[in-house]
Amino acid sequence: SSVERLYVEEKIADEFTKLVVEKTKNLRQGLGKEAETDIGSMSSERQTEIVEDHVKAFEDSGAEILTGGGRNEEAGDIFFEPTVIKNATNKMRPMQEETFGPTLPIATFKTEDEAIDLANDTEFGLTASVWTGDLSRGRRVAEEILAGTVNVNEVLYTHGIGQTPWGGFKNSGYGRTHGKEGLMELVGVQHIHVNRFLFTPDVWWFGYSKNAIETFKQMSRTFASGSIIRTIGLLPQMWKRIKELRNK
């Protein structure tokens, strides 16, 4: 899955963004089959147009394009430059849609709770990652994010470990692949019940009577009494009613 949004703590955002831009400018774009290539092309013309639309929407909404922002025509028709976007907010349309392109919109937060709220403010929830020097804090934040996979200080772990389930929440799909959960998606669950009392009607069979209703109530009181001693004490009375119904 691609990184669609990035939230950075406000007090380090400027320095962090500066480093990201430096790294991005050094990325080598070209054909994916070439070993020297860091980033390839888009998958289609239509997808390239979606990325162009999102970049323009960011600009029109007040965000700042720090590097990239258009097609890399020297590389080919559907090559889009790696693009870093500053001052993005969740109110901007592309932050609520899937881009699937080489864009990195950066938004900021002040508190942990705000970061969680911003991360969850989306109709999608496939994957997320939390980056922190405090592992217990990272685990705590990860548990609050509504995504099928949340990594702490990691990005591609689930792609290399087949035992980890893969799937999303909300509009990011349903079900799972990989792992035990993925295997169970291919299993047809069948329930088989065998009545050991041959030719003896159960109390819930047709037809019904006032006595049958009272028996069901007695069964509910017996097994929901909240006390083992009380349950044992009610069993004889319940069993008597069941035998009366079976012999009707």
Please provide the spans of the model-predicted regions.
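Short beta-strand segments
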Residues: 7, 66-68, 130
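Helix N-cap motif at beta-to-alpha junctions
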Residues: 11-13, 47, 111, 135
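Flexible, acidic loop-helix segments that line cofactor/substrate-binding pockets
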Residues: 1-5, 21-53, 70-79, 96-101, ...
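Short beta-strand and adjoining strand-loop segment in the mid-core
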Residues: 5-12, 84, 172
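Conserved C-terminal structural/oligomerization subdomain of aldehyde/semialdehyde dehydrogenase
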Residues: 28, 72, 79-248
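Glycine/threonine-rich helix-loop capping motifs at alpha-helix boundaries
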Residues: 2, 11-39, 53-68, 87-94, ...
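Phosphate- and divalent-cation-binding pockets in alpha/beta enzyme and binding domains
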Residues: 15-16, 50, 137-140
